[in-house]
Amino acid sequence: MVYRWDCRHCAFSAWSNSDERLRKNAGAHLFDHHSSKLSKADFRVAWDCPYCDAGETAHDKGAAAQAFKDHLDWHAGNSIESNAHLADEVENSGNVLVQTAADSAAADSARLQFTARSDLSIIVTKSPKERLRLLHDRFNGWPDRTVVMTTKRRPLAGAFDIDLSDAPVEVVELDRRLGPSQLGETISRVIDAHHTPDQRLAVGFDILYDIVSSFDLQTTHDFVSMLSSRLSEADALWHIYAEPRPQLSTALNVLEEYIDLTVETESGVFVVNG
């Protein structure tokens, strides 16, 4: 189950698979909006709730602030929606940048949300076994078709106990010498081979940082521009994972025009600001 909370005062939205984590995150956000309601009166600190008649006065400022935060947590919890998905924010198509490390629990949680409704899932990754294990362990069944594309040599060699013999899964080992243009063409060919207009397509992409760090900015821009256009034609959901770091900042500024939604992560909660 995925839960969602929207702020009534600004464009902040948050999602989590934990109702409690989301409630605390939303309550902290409300406290930022209403911290002025915490004021000093005589020798004590008082707060008045902006949503109801509740209030409290205490000598200890920290205790008063915590009581106010706890109360706002309660209000936030009353407006949490259930059975929500990040993909709803872009109506299951478009380009989503998730600002977290590709190999992280937060990324896995996002992957599950973006892949859950897909008929065809394409995954471009350096960690093929981990991506397949996630889908195998967390879904009741595979998407109609899953294609994993990776530069990892012998991608399923070693400890891997999942039987894929009857699974609708294809693993494509890419030549490490491929440039962004050739990679984009390969993805396009996979779409041509497996996608039909009535299917929902999700493309997971773990290697943006590798492209940015290996090629110049113009090459990166051209790759993202062309692949974005190709995926838009297929009405695809492109979910991209990149941990914020200085080496990426310039590239992300240039690529911003192709990103429909940027998602941040905060202790198990996905956050969108505007």
Where would I find each of the regions flagged by the language model?
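Glycine-rich P-loop/Walker A and Walker A-like loops and their local beta1-loop-alpha1 context
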Residues: 79-139
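Substrate-engagement module of ASCE P-loop NTPases
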Residues: 211, 215, 222-247
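Phosphate-binding/switch loop-helix module in NTP-utilizing enzymes
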Residues: 155-156, 163-226
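Cys/His-rich microdomains that often coordinate metals
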Residues: 14, 55-56
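Short cysteine-rich clusters marking metal-coordination/redox-active sites
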Residues: 7-10, 49-52
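Residues immediately within or flanking Cys/His clusters that coordinate Zn2+
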Residues: 4, 44-46
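Phosphate-binding/switch region of NTP-binding enzymes
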Residues: 240-274
